[in-house]
């Protein structure tokens, strides 16, 4: 597996455990790309849902993917602060087509004051039965929910003060 290069524009593809496409982001600019870490940014990019519907993101976002963790984090810059949407997912993979991951339903929404809510537990339970997630996936995801909430409390990684603002400033250099 290679990794995207800084300045490159890539698609992001989200899949479900059964291999079906879940969602695609048309264009994300890579700000940092290594074997273990990818940081990207997008603004008003087209998103295509599995049923073919499309919509456009409303605000600039910084995307954080790590090869060793079963989650990715999107920091969205809004007028009243940075909101984070964290997807419990497989670590990322990258090929010539796109940056890819498997979405495992559970999400954590983090507010500007760093309070958070775990979302979609019912969807996770339903899909784990339908798609027959193996028990090891459940164990890995629960461990990563704990790891992610620890990062939120410690303001570590993408939750560090100024992380999103710093990467957004870098993104602006590519837009001009």
Swiss-Prot record:
The keyword Coiled coil does not apply. The active site is at residue 23. It catalyses: a ribonucleoside 5'-triphosphate + H2O = a ribonucleoside 5'-diphosphate + phosphate + H(+); a ribonucleoside 5'-diphosphate + H2O = a ribonucleoside 5'-phosphate + phosphate + H(+). SUPFAM superfamilies: FomD-like. Its EC number is 3.6.1.15, 3.6.1.6. Pfam families: DUF402 (PF04167). Has nucleoside phosphatase activity towards nucleoside triphosphates and nucleoside diphosphates. This is Nucleoside triphosphate/diphosphate phosphatase. It comes from Bacillus cereus (strain G9842). The lineage of its organism: Bacteria, Bacillati, Bacillota, Bacilli, Bacillales.
